[in-house]
Curated annotation (Swiss-Prot):
InterPro entries given in the database record: Trm112-like (IPR005651)
Pfam families to which the protein is assigned, alphabetical: Trm112p
HAMAP family membership: UPF0434
UniProt record similarity statement: Belongs to the UPF0434 family.
Protein name: UPF0434 protein TM1040_0056
Organism whose genome encodes this protein: Ruegeria sp. (strain TM1040) (Silicibacter sp.)
One GO cellular component, as annotated: cytosol
PANTHER family attached to this UniProt entry: PROTEIN PREY, MITOCHONDRIAL, ZGC:162634
Length: 61
C-alpha cells in the first residue's frame, strides 16, 4: 500500500461477513482483499472500501 491508497479500517471486519456463506472474513493486507475460506473467494478492497460482490471476487487457488 502506498501513501495515495486509503487504508482499510480493520474494525469493519467485525461487521462484515462473506455474502455467500455468512462466515467471517480474513484481511489480507498485502493483496488488499478480504478472504472467505469457506467460499474460497477473495473480495477486493478498492480505495479502502471492500467490494463484496461475488462477480468481483477472485477464486482462491
Amino acid at each position: 500500500m502506498n501513501e495515495t491508497t486509503p487504508a482499510f479500517d480493520r474494525h469493519m471486519l467485525e461487521a462484515l461477513v462473506c455474502p455467500v456463506t455468512q462466515t467471517v472474513l480474513e484481511y489480507d493486507a498485502e493483496a488488499q482483499e478480504l478472504v472467505s475460506r469457506a467460499a474460497n473467494l477473495a473480495f477486493p478492497i478498492r480505495n479502502g472500501i471492500p467490494v463484496m460482490l461475488t462477480d468481483e471476487a477472485r477464486p482462491l487457488e
